[in-house]
A protein has these predicted regions:
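Bacterial Sec-dependent N-terminal signal peptides
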Residues: 1-21
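Short, low-complexity N-terminal intrinsically disordered segments enriched in polar/charged residues
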Residues: 19-29
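Structural motif corresponding to alpha-helix initiation and N-cap regions
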Residues: 25, 59, 95-98
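Short, contiguous alpha-helical
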Residues: 29-33, 37-40, 50-90, 129-174
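Well-ordered alpha-helical scaffold segments within catalytic/enzyme domains
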Residues: 38, 42-43, 77, 111, ...
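Acidic/histidine-rich alpha-helical segments that form the ligand environment
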Residues: 94-129, 136-152
Length: 174
């Protein structure tokens, strides 16, 4: 009986120690690679000559959408990881061309990977400066980041479909 009880306690201790101490930040760290893959693939899928495409006059161009994703990643991830925001020596423009925007997009996701590596759930209630100088919690910035990724992918997918292209998540498995 003591042996069975010992085994049970050992298993219970193993399960208890295996529990993630940072469920929120760990979840976002798990989400990042998938969103990075899909967003980068979506921007790569659009032909270079379509980066000036906009569905209506009031909407941004596809190049502007790519630039917006880059800027959002750099801004929000700097707040999340308490790091200086990445600023290019020469500011990017939506007209900089596909190759330059794709490279900057990849770099922005690498920056987010670094920034997320510096935060854990104990820091989520810390106050950070958000858009327009407003104050909010680091948790708010984290949630805004994941919402942005979903929103931006949906926009990129729409732009692709309006140009007769399939977004990455709708393409047949290779």
């Amino acid at each position: 009986m003591k042996f069975i009880l010992s085994i049970f306690l050992l298993l219970a201790a193993t399960v208890a120690f295996a529990q993630d101490k940072n469920p929120v930040t760990s979840a976002v760290k798990e989400i990042l690679p998938r969103q990075q893959k899909n967003l980068v693939a979506a921007v790569e899928e659009m032909p270079a000559d379509k980066f000036a495409y906009r569905p209506t006059e009031q909407q941004m161009t596809f190049g502007h959408l790519a630039l917006h994703i880059i800027e959002s990643n750099n801004y929000l991830c700097s707040k999340i990881g308490d790091l200086p925001e990445v600023k290019a020596a020469v500011p990017l423009k939506e007209s900089d061309g596909k190759d330059k925007l794709v490279a900057a997009l990849k770099a922005s996701f690498e920056f987010c990977t670094t920034a997320l590596g510096k935060v854990d759930d104990s820091k989520l209630s810390d106050e950070v400066e958000l858009f327009g100088g407003r104050k909010g919690s680091r948790a708010f910035a984290l949630i805004a980041l994941t919402n942005d990724w979903a929103d931006h992918y949906a926009s990129a997918a729409m732009y692709l479909r309006l140009n007769g292209l399939l977004p990455p998540t709708a393409q047949p498995k290779k």
